[in-house]
């Protein structure tokens, strides 16, 4: 299964149904090793063998054993008849530059490709490749049984289909771990979702079935699960900050190297025309009576930071109060507060959760950070204590006056 994205931003989930072959010497040959995959020997299922590597794969072929490598240069006749890179629903025509007997890895020239085969493959297959001469033509054909893939401009493979026609799919992985997933709602809206896991005391994760149920709750009628575990990461660039920040909690402790990812980018440019305010922190969780300082950053019509004017603050729904400087004080009851900053023409909103009764309160020694369950002090002795509260394993913002 995979998810595809079209040029207009719409998405779909389907099996790719790909068929990949190369034609040369009057014969079409299945590309059993695929495109831009590590070269492997052909197995009993006829997977592996002849492999095409473009410069998108790496700087080198990364082969570790001897084999036959054919350096190919794509043909661009200027008419658009052939694609210059492998494309579903199109053919790419190459001209042979060199045929090499390689002992291992070789460079992949920029803008070119390498057709490669392990020296342990059948003599017939090796002879067919060795018969190629500089100037010969090799034609790559990539097709799919699902024509939608011919229109997709981006795609990413997944491990399981989670939701079909608004129903949870069968045969899903029942292990609890971290999972990233992508869902599509009936109106075409795409949801990017991540569940942290493998961290007892914070989040043990979820089964694929539970992730599917959650995506259905969010309105998804189709959904796919990507590879889970420690690679599960969501990062964003906030309007008032530079560079991407990881906003979930990867189980490896930090973001790790991934071979596949989806990046959402914008072609918008700064306009300098004030349109709204970005209120931070926008999703705080406070213990009743706690305070948090809010700030409002001006955003232009393209969501880039820009100069704003003086703003007034108000709580438009929920409990709590906010003063003229943006200092919010949580109310006495649990609930959700919507805090608005406005200059009369542009505005922005932040959302704050108030918890009246925490699940746990802990005490620590202010100086050492050590947990305190009991105290033995000499007469007149003093120790500074720090109280902390949590709700559903989430730390609550609180001050000493809250306890």
Write out the residue ranges for each language-model feature:
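Gly/Ser/Thr/Pro-rich low-complexity, intrinsically disordered segments
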Residues: 1-402
């Amino acid at each position: 299964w995979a998810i595809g994205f079209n040029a207009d931003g719409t998405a779909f989930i389907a099996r790719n149904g790909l068929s990949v072959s190369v034609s040369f010497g009057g014969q079409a040959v299945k590309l059993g090793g695929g495109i831009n995959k590590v070269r492997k020997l052909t197995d009993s299922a006829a997977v592996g063998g002849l492999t095409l590597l473009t410069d998108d794969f790496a700087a080198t072929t990364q082969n570790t054993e001897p084999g036959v490598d054919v350096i190919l240069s794509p043909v661009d006749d200027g008419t658009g008849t052939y694609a210059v890179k492998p494309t579903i629903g199109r053919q790419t025509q190459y001209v042979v530059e060199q045929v090499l007997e390689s002992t291992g890895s070789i460079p992949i020239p920029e803008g070119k490709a390498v057709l490669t085969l392990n020296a342990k493959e059948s003599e017939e297959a090796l002879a067919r490749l060795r018969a190629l001469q500089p100037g010969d033509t090799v034609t790559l054909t990539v097709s799919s049984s699902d024509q939608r893939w011919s229109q997709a401009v981006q795609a990413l493979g997944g491990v399981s289909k989670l939701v079909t026609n608004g129903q949870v799919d069968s045969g899903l992985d029942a292990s609890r771990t971290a999972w990233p997933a992508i869902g599509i709602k009936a109106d075409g809206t795409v949801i990017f979702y991540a569940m942290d896991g493998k961290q007892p005391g914070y989040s043990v994760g979820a089964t694929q079935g539970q992730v599917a149920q959650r995506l259905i709750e969010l309105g998804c009628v189709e959904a796919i699960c990507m590879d889970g575990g420690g690679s599960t990461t969501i990062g964003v660039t906030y309007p008032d900050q530079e560079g991407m920040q990881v906003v979930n909690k990867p189980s490896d402790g930090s973001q790790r190297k991934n071979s596949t990812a989806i990046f959402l980018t914008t072609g918008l440019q700064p306009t300098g025309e004030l349109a709204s305010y970005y209120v931070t922190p926008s999703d705080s969780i406070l213990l009743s009576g706690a305070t948090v300082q809010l700030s409002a950053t001006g955003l232009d019509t393209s969501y880039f930071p820009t100069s704003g004017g003086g703003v007034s603050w108000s709580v438009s729904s929920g409990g709590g109060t906010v003063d003229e400087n943006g200092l919010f004080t949580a109310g006495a009851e649990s609930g959700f507060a919507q805090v608005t900053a406005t200059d009369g023409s542009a505005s922005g909103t932040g959302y704050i959760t108030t918890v009246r009764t925490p699940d746990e309160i802990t005490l620590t020694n202010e100086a050492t950070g050590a947990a305190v369950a009991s105290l033995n002090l000499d007469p007149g002795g003093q120790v500074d204590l720090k109280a902390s509260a949590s709700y559903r394993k989430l730390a609550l913002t609180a001050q000493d006056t809250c306890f």
